[in-house]
Amino acid sequence: KKNVNNKEQQYLCATSLTYFFIDILIQKKNSDFRLSNFLIYVLMATICDVMPLRKINKIIATNVINDFNIKTNAAFNFIFKQFGIKKKLTIDDLGYLLGPIINAGGRLGYSNYATELLSTDNPNIIKKKSIDLIKLNNKRKILEQNILNKINFDKIKQENKNVIIYYKDNIHEGLIGIIAAKLKDYFNKPSIVLTNSNNILKGSARSTPNYNIGQIIKKLLDKKIIENGGGHNMAGGFTIKKNNFLLLDNFIQKDFSNKILAPSNEYKYDSEISMSIINNNFINELNRLGPFGSYNL
């Protein structure tokens, strides 16, 4: 059972929790199975779920990035070759190349593709499923752009709400999180995108560092405004009955207004440096502090 008072656990996504649960089972069975070989997938899930790259997540990231050899993973190695990449794996590769490709199947209704790809050593299956997923990811990009083209950004700007809540029928539910992230980045405001899903609304949220969207989703659950949901500081998802949409909007806007928040575009720094000291050696030393990610820049 999860200890809700343990803040360490708030940094872990479901994949990480599953990994540690299986690790305990392996220890109980005194098995010699090497679960650490699968840490690459824990890190990919951590990055794609926008979890803070701090504490145990930072330890996992450092170990994986330092030790992982792309040639030992046939699926990732094949995908790298399709893009002509010949370098060591980075956090950006997981977040912007491999992650989106692996996730593309699930977003567009073919979740079995990634399972088949990552659970086989058969080179023919690896080739076919990798190419299929790359094609699906390209299709996802086109669908995503078509959705963005239909959004009235000027209207959203004129409404000037503290939290952007956008509803549209017939958005593919696998894309609402990406659209929410795009709106959040464009307006620098917490953003929620909802669409129809089997006679109920499905929502996905992306937030700014000054507004904990996971806490808001919990409040909405406690108030029975939404049917179910969950999340963390920066992202979350939920389902809600259509007739509760205005209630949701009003509750979130009021909650935001009642909080004393630091500006979302305010960044703190530890010291000032002269431009003259920025050179290759300085950048190399800075990179030694990595890998960098959410809440760790």
PLM features: residue spans?
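Hydrophobic, small-residue-rich alpha-helical packing segments that form membrane-like cores
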Residues: K1-A14, R34
